[in-house]
Amino acid sequence: MGEFPTLLQQGNGWFFIPSAILLGILHGLEPGHSKTMMAAFIIAIKGTVKQAVMLGLAATLSHTAIVWLIALGGMYLSRAFTAQSVEPWLQLISAIIILSTACWMFWRTWRGEQQWLAGNHHHDHDHDHDHDHDHHGHIHPEGATSKAYQDAHERAHAADIQRRFDGQTVTNGQILLFGLTGGLIPCPAAITVLLICIQLKAFTLGATMVLSFSLSLALTLVTVGVGAAISVQQAAKRWSGFSTLARRAPYFSSILIGLVGVYMGIHGYTGIMQ
């Protein structure tokens, strides 16, 4: 592939940039340790909007550093593969890995939602059985429904954070350190960016992709932190689709990653057949 201006003239470059932006936004919405711990931390320390922005930017910085290291390392290693006969096979192998990642993400999200629905149904059944004598309605807050979907390991981290920091005075340095450590968790989206950058063989376009991913991820994480500072529960009450959107975001991410894999697989297969 050529440089970024050439790709734009050929009409190919547009596919990668919007995909990276959308992937960063969707990844930021996916259930994950950093987002949950950030929200729990801000709520526990009764943080301000400024502190929420600091926390979100710190988490984004460390998370982005991991993506940059992976992407730059991939582009550096790709210099060893210059033969035209090898490149189509690399594209095909990368496509298989990307499609496998997309299928794993989709299956994991579906399984988690099914477990949540089964547990919620069991809770409702027990609740009706134990309180069938009570003629007064018992309403569960929207926040409880949203929290019920979170991974058990994720909830344990959030609860531990709230116990440790509840009511304590926290310095800006501690907030930055917490954000930096919270963003070091790798993600399937970073693997996708790595494989795409290997195939692009163009630093400008690869760097633009990673930058687009990073900026959209930063916007999402900062929004999550600010939302926690002004109360996530209030946001959920004002918009009933908030928890549904967060719950379904991994589906869109897996579909987007799958489309990227199909695109690369077609190009690799075409190159091999030629």
Swiss-Prot record:
It is a multi-pass membrane protein. One of its GO terms (molecular function) is nickel cation transmembrane transporter activity. Induction: By nickel and cobalt. Transcriptionally repressed by RcnR. One of its GO terms (cellular component) is plasma membrane. Keywords: Cell inner membrane, Cell membrane, Cobalt, Cobalt transport, Ion transport, Membrane, Nickel, Nickel transport, Transmembrane, Transmembrane helix, Transport. GO terms for biological process: cobalt ion transport; response to cobalt ion; response to nickel cation. The keyword Manganese does not apply. Its main location: membrane. Residues 34-51, 107-174, 231-251 are cytoplasmic. Residues 122-141 have a biased composition (Basic and acidic residues). PANTHER family: NICKEL/COBALT EFFLUX SYSTEM RCNA, NICKEL_COBALT EFFLUX SYSTEM RCNA. This is Nickel/cobalt efflux system RcnA. The lineage of its organism: Bacteria, Pseudomonadati, Pseudomonadota, Gammaproteobacteria, Enterobacterales. The gene is rcnA.
